[in-house]
């Protein structure tokens, strides 16, 4: 007999498994026959179960009858044993002390009765003497024992009028004055001592609980004072609840508590200290450990939460092991790609990346339209770049003109994905992601969740492509992109989607005319905006220039930011505003999202946003990084469609108060149906 070939057996097994996994067509008649067989099996199984149940019931009934028969036999035997007992009857207990002669007719019955009575009197006298020799406390103690074990004597009431009166009046408030009360002085509840008496029991309970508390219990130690190895499952759960971190997915690592505990390279940790990042934000705590495991990631967080560093640091850590670009590899494109919806946000991200990438020797190139021509972009790419930050439109132009390829791109970031889709860049995103090399795509199975497999190098210059998406909301269009291009992603949600920043005080004012709107704007700037950075949002470009001109005529220093400005003009306006040379920035929604301008203390919505989502992002320009801010909104008759949502979002804020006009407005009472 020839020896078994293990490879042949495995090959046959694999072929059989693949054959079984293939879908096969089943004719209609065969399907009907299979359904009938399945139905017949179900009926047979039900019939078998009923028979077993009936059999069990009959056995129980038979056992019950046997037990009853045994009990009858036992009673009969006891009855026969009583009948066979021939002992002399003793008679009634009261007559046992009589002499036998009294029953024999000797006429001595009366003497016996007298003797019995005398004996009873003697016993009573002895009992009285015994009771007399005991103290009153002993007698009372005996009565208590008797009442405890035998109950109170018959026909003896246990009612206590004092107890009932105290029980019924304890919780009642006395509205009448006592004749002894001094009504000339104001009555003070604290002076009566009633609050002390009512809280006495609770205070004593708290005192006892504190006295018995074990202060060495590790559960009472805050997570900041614990070593990483001492953190329990309960500690991590409370940690995530306190920071409003919600994660979804398999094999999610625990969040990062401190920068020192992260697995980032030492060069990045040193740079973090130099730039002054003392403590990670919630999105950084949750997202960085997941991204460092080479997992695809979807991050949903409110504006101003530190999302840029949350994807920049893992990106640099991922491409650090790749070799430096040379004359050959520099033509293959970048190692990492970051897409942003606006030119301002792309420029801001480039500045953030340069902070950390310079010490690692990486080159960062920003591709945005309007600032420079396509030829200038080609010149910037002549020596290659490890990292490219771009807007979707300009990057598609570079790809179509063959100025750039993405043959070795291993890390892709989609920042503000919902904003890119809303801006009409969905087709551009699909074109860019389709231009990525399929050779380093992740498998669409559980291997995509295994960090050991995903961290492998496919070639010396190529790793599995990791895709990261950040957004403030998750509309269906963004979900489609995530479903098509992200493989088994982990999801991180910080706070509640669509809510405003908790550190912003919101105010809303009703205005009727344009003149009233301008007068209130000047009044708010004089009241709250003196010496502070203020952003004024308008809905149209023409109105943006008109409002800025009106403010300048009122001796306010103002600059404008809208889509008709060139890139140089927009950057100059932003730089002037950041430096404090101008304290009022009048802008359209182009500055509503993504821009991180520190120390903005006031946002004024000269025109209410068309949707509550845009409103949320507008007021998110202030109150960033834990600082407090204020947002003032002017509403008019044209804003009826968003009044309900504005009322809801203001009522959820602990720092804001819904004004009476908005609370009672008819359009704010029910959700609009359009």
Swiss-Prot record:
PROSITE patterns, sorted: DEAD_ATP_HELICASE, HELICASE_ATP_BIND_1, HELICASE_CTER, Q_MOTIF
Cell compartments where the protein resides: Cytoplasm; Nucleus
Residues engaged in binding ATP: 301-308
SMART domains, alphabetized: DEXDc (SM00487), HELICc (SM00490)
Region (Disordered): 14-213
One Pfam family matching this protein: Helicase_C
Broad class of where this protein is predominantly found: cytoplasm
Compositional bias of kind Basic and acidic residues: 32-67, 74-86, 135-147, 168-198
Keyword ATP-binding: yes
GO biological process: mRNA processing; RNA splicing
Catalytic activity: ATP + H2O = ADP + phosphate + H(+)
UniProt entry keywords in alphabetical sequence: ATP-binding, Cytoplasm, Helicase, Hydrolase, mRNA processing, mRNA splicing, Nucleotide-binding, Nucleus
Residue ranges constituting the Helicase ATP-binding domain according to the UniProt record: 288-492
Motif position, Q motif: 257-285
InterPro entries in alphabetical order: DEAD/DEAH_box_helicase_dom, Helicase_ATP-bd, Helicase_C-like, P-loop_NTPase, RNA-helicase_DEAD-box_CS, RNA_helicase_DEAD_Q_motif
Domain Helicase C-terminal per the UniProt entry, residue ranges: 520-666
GO CC annotation, single: nucleus
Free-text function comment from the UniProt entry: ATP-dependent RNA helicase involved in mRNA splicing. May destabilize the U1/5'-splice site duplex to permit an effective competition for the 5'-splice site by the U6 snRNA, resulting in the switch between U1 and U6 at the 5'-splice site. May also act to unwind the U4/U6 base-pairing interaction in the U4/U6/U5 snRNP, facilitating the first covalent step of splicing.
Subunit structure comment from the entry: Component of the U5 snRNP complex.
Protein's name in the database: Pre-mRNA-splicing ATP-dependent RNA helicase PRP28
Organism, as annotated: Pyricularia oryzae (strain 70-15 / ATCC MYA-4617 / FGSC 8958)
């Amino acid at each position: 007999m020839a020896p078994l070939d293990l490879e042949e057996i495995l090959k046959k097994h694999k072929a059989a498994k693949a054959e079984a996994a293939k879908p096969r067509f089943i004719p209609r008649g065969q399907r009907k026959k299979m359904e009938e067989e399945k139905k017949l099996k179900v009926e047979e199984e039900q019939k078998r179960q009923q028979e077993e149940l009936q059999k069990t019931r009959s056995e129980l009934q038979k056992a019950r009858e046997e037990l009853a028969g045994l009990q009858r036999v036992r009673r009969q035997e006891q009855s026969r044993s009583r009948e066979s007992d021939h002992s002399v009857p003793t008679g009634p207990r009261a007559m046992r002390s009589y002499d036998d002669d009294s029953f024999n007719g000797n006429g001595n019955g009366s003497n016996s009765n007298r003797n019995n009575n005398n004996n009873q009197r003697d016993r009573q006298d002895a009992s009285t003497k015994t009771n007399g020799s005991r103290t009153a406390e002993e007698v009372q103690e005996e009565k208590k024992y008797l009442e405890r074990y035998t109950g109170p004597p018959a026909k003896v009431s246990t009612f206590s009028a004092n107890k009932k009166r105290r029980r019924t009046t304890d919780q009642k408030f006395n509205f009448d004055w006592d004749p002894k009360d001094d009504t000339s002085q104001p009555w003070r509840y604290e002076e009566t001592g009633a609050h002390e008496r009512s809280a006495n029991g609770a205070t004593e309970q708290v005192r006892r609980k504190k006295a018995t508390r074990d202060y060495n219990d590790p559960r009472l130690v805050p997570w900041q004072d614990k070593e990483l190895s001492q953190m329990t499952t309960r500690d991590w759960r409370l940690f995530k609840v306190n920071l409003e971190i919600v994660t979804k997915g398999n094999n999610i690592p625990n969040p990062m508590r401190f920068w020192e505990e992260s697995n980032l390279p030492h060069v990045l940790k040193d740079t973090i200290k130099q730039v002054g990042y003392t403590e990670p934000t919630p999105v950084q705590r949750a997202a960085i450990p997941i991204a460092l495991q080479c997992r695809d990631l979807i991050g949903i967080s409110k504006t101003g939460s530190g999302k840029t560093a949350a994807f920049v640091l893992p990106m640099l850590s991922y491409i650090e092991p790749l070799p430096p670009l040379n004359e050959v590899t520099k033509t293959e494109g970048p190692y990492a790609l970051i897409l942003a919806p606006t030119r301002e946000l792309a420029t801001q991200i480039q500045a953030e990346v340069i902070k950390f990438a310079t010490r690692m020797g990486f080159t960062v190139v920003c591709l945005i339209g309007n600032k420079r021509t396509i030829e200038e972009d080609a010149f910037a790419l002549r020596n290659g770049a490890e990292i490219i930050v771009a807007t979707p439109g300009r990057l598609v132009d570079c790809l179509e003109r063959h100025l750039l390829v993405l043959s070795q791109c291993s890390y892709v970031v989609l920042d503000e994905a919902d904003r890119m889709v809303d801006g009409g860049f969905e087709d551009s995103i699909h074109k860019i992601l389709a231009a990525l090399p399929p050779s380093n795509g992740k498998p669409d199975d559980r291997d995509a969740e295994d960090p050991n497999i995903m961290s492998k190098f496919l070639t010396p210059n190529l790793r599995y492509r990791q895709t990261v998406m950040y957004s403030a909301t998750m509309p269906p269009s963004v979900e489609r992109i995530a479903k098509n291009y992200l493989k088994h992603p982990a999801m991180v949600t910080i706070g509640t989607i669509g809510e405003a920043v908790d550190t912003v005080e919101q105010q809303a004012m009703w205005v009727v005319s344009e003149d009233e709107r301008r007068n209130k704007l000047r009044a708010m700037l004089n009241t709250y905006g003196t010496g502070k950075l203020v952003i004024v949002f308008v809905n149209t470009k023409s109105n943006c220039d008109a409002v800025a001109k009106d403010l300048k005529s009122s001796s306010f220093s103002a600059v404008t930011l809208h889509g008709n400005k060139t890139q140089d003009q927009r950057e100059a306006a932003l730089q002037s505003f950041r430096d404090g040379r101008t304290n009022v920035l009048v802008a359209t929604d182009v500055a509503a999202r993504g821009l991180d301008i520190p120390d903005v203390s006031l946002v004024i919505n000269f025109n209410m946003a068309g949707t509550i989502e845009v409103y949320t992002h507008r007021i998110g320009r202030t109150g960033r990084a834990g600082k407090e801010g204020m947002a003032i909104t002017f509403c008019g008759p044209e804003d009826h469609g968003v009044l309900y949502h504005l009322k809801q979002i203001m009522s959820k804020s602990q720092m804001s108060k819904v004004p009476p006009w908005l609370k009672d407005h008819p359009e704010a009472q029910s959700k609009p149906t359009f």
